[in-house]
Amino acid sequence: MVNLRPSAPLSRLLLGYAPSDARTRQALWWHWDERLAAILQGGREPAIMAIRLAWWRDVLVQGDEGKGRGEPLVDALRKPGLTDFDRQYIGRCVEGWGQIAGAEALSAEDLQAYAQGRGGGLFSLLAGQSSPAIVAAGGIWALWDLAAHLSDPELAAVCLAVAQDLLPDAQLGRSTVERPLRLALMVAAHDVQQQRIPIRGFGPRHYVRLLLASLTR
């Protein structure tokens, strides 16, 4: 059986806080985000990245049933039926990743567009709804996650600075479906507030932060 759960430690832990009726779908969205990230991580030519990102848009947004059939993740996402809401925010995720795919230099504006697209789109899909707070929270998480994977410390610092500007807008609601998002935000926001680059990604101190946040959020 194909494993369609995410591999990143934080997203795997967050699934434990998701409502049981939303957990499977949230796992698929986290896994899908990892698949998009993998497109950018192989040092490929920008044109190849663009083609592979466009494939996901064609399959999931444009509804090209001739593509993707038999691909386990595509089949799993299509099985319950993709709504207009899903397609809208899938498109935003793809556009967000496209903002940084193959870019030689990234401006604060590029990072803002990436954050709103990838992070805002993903968090909206995870919650099954969207709001300015959900988009801001997703943007903070996406910039924090990007900073953890950059070899350029100066660009990573810019990511955290852009994320800091989003903090006032990231006031998430108290619904159970948003709980994993609140916890992800708490983990990322702590580093963002301190402008501390998560050099090794999710580590022991983040795990402690997640546990503490889970007691109150």
Predicted regions and their residues:
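Short alpha-helix boundary/capping elements
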Residues: L60-E65, F85, A101
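Acidic/His metal-coordination segments adjacent to aromatic residues that form catalytic metal sites
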Residues: G96-S107
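Catalytic cores of Mg2+-dependent Asp-rich isoprenoid enzymes
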Residues: M1-W55, G66-D75, Y89-G96, L111-R217
